[in-house]
A protein has these predicted regions:
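Gly/Ser/Thr-rich active-site cleft segment
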Residues: 2-132
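Catalytic phosphate/nucleotide-handling subdomain of diverse soluble enzymes
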Residues: 114-121, 126-185
């Protein structure tokens, strides 16, 4: 995928897993309705909305920082790959809708409240933010969401996250692109 997209696609990304499943002709693909992250799935179970935060989405499929949505050129390329593998869905049909910080990501439904609290004390209606992973949380916690800011994480792995002022000029396989909760790379 990195070669087809001219953009580094780490093997851990959702789209890389889907691509490998297609290359391996895995049987479950015939009934595949959609793909999501754990955070996105839990959010859908609580709100009924299949949405995901832009930072979380950037670990599923490349994001265009100008639009804050999946990169249209790469979506078109992956649609061609899906067709080559006789998949019935398009990229956009498979992926959750992207939301930026502050976007309407739904409310806690009665069913969602019951999942969290079967006793009925928790009531539906709470506003829900777009689900994000730990990268976005770290960026916000360290106020590293503006251009030319960054942070270093030293936990299970050690890495730096830097908010760029412009797109990279070429593919660097050692750099994994992520997106801030506001949609910047």
């Amino acid at each position: 995928l990195t070669e087809r997209f001219s953009f580094n696609i780490p093997q851990r990304w959702s789209i890389a897993h889907l691509y490998q499943a297609m290359l391996s002709n895995e049987a479950h693909l015939a009934s595949l309705a959609s793909i999501n992250t754990l955070a996105g799935y839990v959010h859908e179970m609580l709100t009924g909305k299949r949405v995901i935060g832009v930072g979380e989405a950037s670990g599923m499929f490349p994001i265009d920082s100008e639009t804050g949505d999946y990169d249209a050129r790469m979506v078109k390329t992956f649609d061609q790959i899906l067709a080559e593998h006789h998949m019935s869905k398009t990229t956009k049909q498979l992926l959750p809708t992207v939301c930026k910080a502050g976007d309407d990501a739904g409310v806690l439904t009665a069913e969602g409240a019951n999942r969290l609290d079967p006793t009925g004390v928790l009531q539906p209606g709470a506003l829900m933010c777009p689900p994000e992973g730990d990268a976005g949380t770290g960026m916000v916690a360290t106020n590293s969401i503006k251009v030319c800011t960054g942070n270093v994480s030293a936990g299970t792995s050690i890495f730096a996250m830097i908010v760029l002022s412009k797109a990279l000029s070429r593919v660097y396989p050692e750099i994994d692109m992520v997106t801030t909760p506001e949609g910047l790379s």
